[in-house]
Amino acid sequence: MVVEDTIKATSAEDLSNSIANQNPRGRGGEEDEELEEGEIVGDDDLDSSNLSAALVHQPNPLEHSWTFWFDNPSAKSKQATWGASIRPIYTFSTVEEFWSVYNNIHHPSKLAMRADLYCFKHKIEPKWEDPVCANGGKWTVNFPRGKSDNGWLYTLLAMIGEQFDCGDEICGAVVNVRSGQDKISIWTKNASNEAAQASIGKQWKEFLDYNESIGFIFHDDAKKFDRHAKNKYMA
């Protein structure tokens, strides 16, 4: 599978080199336009006809279908319930569809403050209340503000390319844009499965070439203690 060939490299440098060979835009693409408040894509960027026109080669199917979701920062203050402002953007099931969507939405460095961009397996909603996520938790990596673009891409490629030994445990990933830092998290299904969580955390650091310690928090603890929730596992 094309995407598997893309991300079999275990270092960020090797991965970056191979990505350019699969990405239709490559490294010579123009910079994204500036983002308006609460915007994730331009008016016509995700028009279905534009996406269809880009899929000119024989498609390379992914093992799972995935859905991008977006939480608009300008809508959050108007919602009484957490997660009520999250909306699906597009569901993709091939390598070509992934690149068509990825190249036409703003990357983390271009998103507005307090925006959240998700990529989850199809039919799994990025919410604690989703039955698949309810008993899970998350690994989190922190980046300086505006420096998470590569980490986000490498995380996406590792997930959709099924490069994690315990990939069945993964629900999806989210990048949170906050003041002073960006946070990328991988959500998993069974927080109590320590061996699986340890494997995911260790491999994720290898894919990102990330040397600092990262922590895993149970969703139940996050709901109870919010920002004061403590890490249960470390990698």
From Swiss-Prot:
Residues 13-24 have a biased composition (Polar residues). It is found in: Nucleus; Cytoplasm. According to the redox status, the Cys-133-Cys-171 disulfide bridge may have a role in regulating protein function by affecting its ability to bind capped mRNA. GO terms for cellular component: cytoplasm; eukaryotic translation initiation factor 4F complex; nucleus. MRNA binds at residues 78-83, 110, 128-129, 178-183, 223-227. Disulfide bonds join C133-C171. GO terms for molecular function: RNA 7-methylguanosine cap binding; RNA binding; translation initiation factor activity. Keywords: Cytoplasm, Disulfide bond, Host-virus interaction, Initiation factor, Nucleus, Plant defense, Protein biosynthesis, RNA-binding, Translation regulation. Residues 1-37 are annotated as: Disordered. InterPro entries: TIF_eIF4e-like, TIF_eIF_4E, TIF_eIF_4E_CS. Transmembrane segments: none annotated. Belongs to the eukaryotic initiation factor 4E family. Component of the protein complex eIF4F, which is involved in the recognition of the mRNA cap, ATP-dependent unwinding of 5'-terminal secondary structure and recruitment of mRNA to the ribosome. Recognizes and binds the 7-methylguanosine-containing mRNA cap during an early step in the initiation of protein synthesis and facilitates ribosome binding by inducing the unwinding of the mRNAs secondary structures. Key component of recessive resistance to potyviruses. EIF4F is a multi-subunit complex, the composition of which varies with external and internal environmental conditions. It is composed of at least EIF4A, EIF4E and EIF4G. EIF4E is also known to interact with other partners. In higher plants two isoforms of EIF4F have been identified, named isoform EIF4F and isoform EIF(iso)4F. Isoform EIF4F has subunits p220 and p26, whereas isoform EIF(iso)4F has subunits p82 and p28. (Microbial infection) Interacts with potyvirus viral genome-linked protein (VPg); this interaction is possible in susceptible hosts but impaired in resistant plants. This is Eukaryotic translation initiation factor 4E-1. It comes from Cucumis zeyherii.
